[in-house]
Amino acid sequence: MIEKIIKDELEKFYPEMIELRRYMHMHPEVSFNEKNTARFIKEYLEKIGITDIKTKVGLNGVVARIKGQDSSKSIAFRADFDALPINDAKNTSYKSTIPNAMHACGHDGHTTALLATCKVLIQNQEKLPHDVVAVFQYGEEQAPGGAKPMIDASCLQDVDAIFGAHLWTPLSLGTLGYSYSELCAAADRFEVKINTKENANIIAAEFVSMTQQIVSRFSKPRETLVITLGKLESSIEKASITGTIRHFNKELHKMVLTKLQNLCKALENEYSGTNIEFIYYGGYPPLINHKKGTIEIQKATSKILPDIKQLEIEPLMIGEDFAYYVEEVPGAFFLIGAGNSTFAKYPHHHPNFDFEEEVMKQTASIFLTLAFDSANVINNLKGEQ
């Protein structure tokens, strides 16, 4: 039975998984600078016998293909591998050795889970119905991210379904967090620069006040829209305001941009000798799962991890560039609990962040169950838009 093979193989590889994760944790590389990590991934894939490997996909991406019995279809899994510009404050044997670089979001765990998935697959290749594509992605933490450049470089070529996971310390180990639709919000960044012969403090204050009226007047009561102004610097003649827009609706997003630009023009007209520049930096689109993709995740989890608690979660107001993949092909993204009440209690992006390493085995087991059942999974996702 394939479930027994998955469990036995992952149990056997688990000490190696811990070694892989801790090596990456000790040698983190921040977004768009992950050359050594990419090389580490490639060399490990070669070591376990995978030959179809593409490197420098997009920039630092690595894509591996494992042949199944029928290569006319394929299923993909994605793991991100970039770190954050944070100093690791943990007192552990595997804390970061690189100043101002830390795996403070669990991407080392994601990568380890997918490497373990690849190892089990290559050793049981004859049982694999269709090809499996392993997408190791750089640059998730910093927009514009690595997903879009990797897609533009054809990482999804001939892919029929894609799945991804994020280990999540707000959920306890032994919990699956799922959503049938919206999971992560779009996160767009903008900046407003004010130059004036009047008082920039007053103009900036009026801009701040009016942005919240956009939220209250122009969004529907059940429609999520958050405009956050995170930084304001002001003197008499100059002011700078930076903010983010978070939403799940592209039409609402267009409306908000228009309203903010119109607000800048209105303030220019109201205060003589004033020039206001609105700069839009963009961000990730909302991550909206395909319902059938989430159902396949739930089925796989029930099959391989019957004791795990499955919890439908509210949409998160964070950005995640896996959104780009499910805009291209059917699939879904899930959260998997990695927290506890002791060392793994800290939020993501915290200098003391850590997680229950057992979650890597659980993530790999879900990926493997989907992969070995890829004929049914791909067929069940047909027609998903």
PLM regions: where:
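Histidine/acidic-residue-rich, glycine-tolerant segments that coordinate divalent metal ions
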Residues: 62, 84-86, 90-102, 108-112, ...
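Acidic/His- and Gly-rich active-site-bordering loop/insert found
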Residues: 2-103, 108, 112-115, 119-128
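Divalent metal-coordination and catalytic microenvironments
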Residues: 24, 64, 77, 107, ...
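Non-cysteine beta-strand/loop elements that form the S-adenosyl-L-methionine
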Residues: 76-78, 87, 190-192, 333-339
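Metal-dependent amide/peptide-bond hydrolase catalytic core
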Residues: 201-385
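N-terminal hydrophobic/helix-forming segments and targeting peptides
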Residues: 1-22, 28, 70, 123, ...
